Amino acid sequence: MLCFEAICLGAINSSSKNFTCVKEFVRAYPELTNKITNEHPEYFIDGSILRICVNDKAILNKLLASG
């Protein structure tokens, strides 16, 4: 899970804001992504990353509202 947070930090801090690595992680590890979403949503770092990773609109809205 901390690897995911590191990937998100790298993506959000890069000048290009390229989220390809984040997207590939989510595609490759959907179960782990769900666990992160439920247990550690702060690992997404930013709402822009949440929006590309979380497909469930209700969960997305809940997480965006709580942050």
Curated annotation (Swiss-Prot):
This is Uncharacterized protein RC0023.
